[in-house]
C-alpha cells in the first residue's frame, strides 16, 4: 500500500531534512507534502521548501505557505510557477470566509491547487504580541462559504477541527469538495477523540473515505502517528480500498496525480 503524508513541515534546525527523509524511509512513506511556516513557527520559509524539493524531488511535494491578509494571489501564481502543487493556509488576519480573501481561493481553484486549512486552536512557538491571531478566524465552518462559492476547489480541514470536531464532521459530510486529515501530536486532540471513539463523529456510511493521512509532527513522532492511525482503522474494520484512499488515493486525486 502506498503511503503519502499530506501534512508535514520543515523545521529550521540542522539536519532536519535528512532526519525527515530517514523517518519516511523507516515508515515506508513514499512522499510527503511539505510546507514551511517561517520564523513564527520555527520553520523554514517558502524558499527553504523550494531548496528542499530540489534535493529530494521524488520524495517531497511542495505546499506553499500563504497567510491571508499578508500574501496575495500573485504569490500563489508565483509558487505555482516554481513547482508548488498545493497551498497551506493558517493565521489569517481576518476570518477565512472574509470576502477580501476570495481572490486567493479563486486563484487556487483556477490553478487546481488543493488547500490545506489549519482549523482550531493554533500553537505558535514564537510569541509576537502585536500579532492578533485568533482561532475563531479558523473555525471549520469558515470553510463552508468557500466550498460553496468555489465548488471545484479542493479543501482539506487540518486536524479535524481540533476542538470543533462536530462542525468539521458535518462539513465533511455535506460538502463534496471537503476532506479532512487527522494530524496532530499523539498527546493532543487525537487522544481525546480516540478515548471516546472517532465514530461518534464519522458515523455515516463512507465517512472514512474522506480522510487524508497526515502527521504534522516532528520526524521522531511520525512512526507513532502512523501506528495509531492503522490501529484506529483496525478497530473499525476499515476495508483495504478505503485504506488506500486514506493513505494515498485521496491526496493523489486532489493533486491530480492519479
Pin down the residues of each PLM region.
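A generic "structured core" feature
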Residues: 2-4, 104, 116, 146-149, ...
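Short active-site segment of divalent metal-dependent hydrolases/proteases
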Residues: 10-11, 121, 162, 219
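Active-site neighborhood of phospho(di)ester-bond hydrolases with catalytic His/Asp-centered motifs
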Residues: 3-6, 33-36, 63-64, 88, ...
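Short, acidic/polar
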Residues: 13-24, 44, 68-79, 165, ...
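Active-site gating/metal-coordination segments in enzymes
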Residues: 39, 43-132, 136-137, 178, ...
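Catalytic pocket-lining loop regions of alpha/beta-barrel enzymes
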Residues: 86, 101-212
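Conserved, mostly hydrophobic/aromatic
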Residues: 7, 24, 49, 79, ...
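Mid-to-C-terminal alpha-helical segments outside catalytic/metal-binding sites
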Residues: 1-9, 15-31, 35, 77-78, ...
Amino acid at each position: 500500500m502506498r503511503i503519502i503524508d499530506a501534512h508535514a513541515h520543515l523545521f529550521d534546525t540542522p539536519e532536519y531534512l535528512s532526519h525527515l527523509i530517514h523517518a519516511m524511509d523507516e515508515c515506508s512513506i513514499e512522499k510527503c507534502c511539505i510546507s514551511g511556516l517561517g520564523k513564527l513557527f520555527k520553520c523554514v520559509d517558502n524558499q527553504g521548501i523550494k531548496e528542499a524539493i530540489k534535493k529530494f524531488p521524488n520524495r517531497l511535494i511542495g505546499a506553499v505557505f500563504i497567510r491571508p491578509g499578508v500574501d496575495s494571489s500573485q504569490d500563489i501564481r508565483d509558487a505555482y510557477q516554481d513547482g508548488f502543487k498545493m497551498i497551506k493556509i493558517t493565521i489569517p488576519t481576518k476570518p477565512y470566509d472574509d470576502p477580501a480573501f476570495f481572490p486567493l481561493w479563486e486563484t487556487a481553484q483556477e490553478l487546481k491547487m488543493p488547500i490545506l486549512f489549519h482549523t482550531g486552536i493554533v500553537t505558535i512557538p514564537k510569541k509576537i504580541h502585536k500579532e492578533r491571531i485568533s482561532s475563531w478566524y479558523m473555525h471549520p465552518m469558515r470553510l463552508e462559504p468557500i466550498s460553496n462559492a468555489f465548488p471545484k476547489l479542493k479543501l482539506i480541514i487540518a486536524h479535524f477541527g481540533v476542538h470543533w470536531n462536530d462542525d468539521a464532521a458535518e462539513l465533511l459530510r455535506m460538502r463534496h469538495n471537503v476532506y479532512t486529515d487527522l494530524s496532530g501530536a499523539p498527546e493532543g486532540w487525537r487522544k481525546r477523540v480516540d478515548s471516546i471513539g472517532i465514530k461518534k463523529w464519522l458515523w455515516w456510511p463512507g465517512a472514512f473515505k474522506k480522510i487524508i493521512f497526515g502527521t504534522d509532527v516532528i520526524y521522531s513522532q511520525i512512526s507513532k502517528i502512523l501506528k495509531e492511525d492503522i490501529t484506529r482503522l483496525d478497530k473499525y474494520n476499515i476495508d483495504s480500498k478505503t485504506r488506500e484512499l486514506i493513505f494515498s488515493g485521496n491526496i493523489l486525486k486532489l493533486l491530480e496525480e492519479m
